[in-house]
Regions:
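Terminal membrane-proximal soluble interaction domains of membrane-associated proteins
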Residues: 14-102
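Transmembrane alpha-helices and immediately adjacent membrane-cytoplasm interface residues
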Residues: 1-4, 8-10
C-alpha cells in the first residue's frame, strides 16, 4: 500500500491532500500527507483527528504517522505530486509560496 500511496493518480488508497502542521513544536512547519480521518474517544469526549504521514526526505518510504486534531491541520493548495516533489527535493522545488486553503 505504501508504494501505491507514493504514486499519484493510482486508484485505491493513497495520499489524499498535502497539509502543513506545526511540528515538532509550535512555529515550525512540517509538510505532510493526509492518509485518513478518524475520531478518537477519550472518556465521554470524542474529537476528530486526521492521520498525517510525515515522510523523511529524500526517501519518502521512511517517515512516521501523527494523529493531528482537525483544527491544527492546514490544507495546502497543491497536488500530491507537487507535494512529493517539494519533499523529495528537500524544499528546492517550490514556487516560493505555499497557499493554505481557507
Amino acid at each position: 500500500d505504501i508504494i501505491n500511496a507514493l504514486q499519484p493518480g493510482k486508484k485505491g488508497r493513497s495520499f489524499r491532500q498535502v497539509v502543513m502542521i506545526d511540528y515538532p513544536r509550535p512555529g515550525l512547519k512540517t509538510i505532510g500527507f493526509v492518509t485518513n480521518e478518524l475520531d478518537i474517544q477519550e472518556g465521554s469526549n470524542t474529537e476528530g483527528y486526521i492521520s498525517v504521514y510525515l515522510p523523511n526526505p529524500p526517501n519518502p518510504t521512511s517517515g512516521f504517522l501523527v494523529l493531528v486534531p482537525r483544527s491544527d491541520v492546514h490544507v495546502i493548495d497543491m497536488s500530491v505530486e507537487e507535494g512529493l516533489k517539494l519533499v523529495l527535493s528537500g524544499g528546492i522545488v517550490t514556487s516560493g509560496l505555499l497557499k493554505c486553503k481557507v
